[in-house]
């Protein structure tokens, strides 16, 4: 496995692979890797000849400076995990390498980038589109892999790829969970022991809520999820929306879509956790 810091070097390595008609798979990450990321890497290794993983904490997608500063950075440990998972190239550029000058591009990706996370974190998805488009131009992968925990992010990236005509297949991989149901996230390490004990309530409540469909209305299911989670004093639901899984538009009735997905964000103490479930 090679660890590469410069765009020029990575492009040189990958040019050889492309000349040999090798299929290139790519997993973009911000590091602080866990088994969720590693499952993406395993999908990538299995279905491609070359596996590239980027580790880059992208400043343009953080709308909270404190969040950027406290985001865990564990490159050495990440590389050990990536090597054992069969990764070929780790691309770990500096901010200066990725942004030699400010990226002033703004993306208009419609509803998928405006609702839920888009409304709560202004500029977040624009930053995601900036960095992922740059990474796609650098790596030129055949396949890219993203985790369904960030359900909305996948919709944003699909819209961006379509708009920019980037020839890459976006692969969405299932959420990986702890034994008690909590969706794996780099932010979980910031939970106190008490918060960590309480956090599985999110996944448990979402799962329970699927048993009410179609008997209860969409609004009744939303109320149940929000009230159940908020009944724990450590937890506060920021939003819970049931949307069409393709357009991300909120639905009022189950008949509005054949692909209803519930997307939730919960503050567990200071830590912001996200999850989703298909109905």
From Swiss-Prot:
Compartments in which it is found: Cytoplasm
Residues the entry annotates as binding (R)-pantoate: 61, 153
Additional record remark: The reaction proceeds by a bi uni uni bi ping pong mechanism.
Binding site for beta-alanine: 61
Subunit field text: Homodimer.
Gene behind the chain: panC
Residues annotated for ATP binding in this entry: 30-37, 147-150, 176, 184-187
A single GO cellular-component term on record: cytosol
Record key words, sorted: ATP-binding, Cytoplasm, Ligase, Nucleotide-binding, Pantothenate biosynthesis
Known catalytic reactions: (R)-pantoate + beta-alanine + ATP = (R)-pantothenate + AMP + diphosphate + H(+)
GO biological process, one term: pantothenate biosynthetic process
Family statement drawn from the similarity comment of this UniProt entry: Belongs to the pantothenate synthetase family.
Coiled coil stretches, renumbered: none
Pfam families given in the database record: Pantoate_ligase
UniProt-listed Enzyme Commission number(s): 6.3.2.1
This protein's pathway: Cofactor biosynthesis; (R)-pantothenate biosynthesis; (R)-pantothenate from (R)-pantoate and beta-alanine: step 1/1
Entry protein name: Pantothenate synthetase
One Gene Ontology MF term: ATP binding
Residues annotated as catalytic: 37
Primary location: cytoplasm
Role this protein plays: Catalyzes the condensation of pantoate with beta-alanine in an ATP-dependent reaction via a pantoyl-adenylate intermediate.
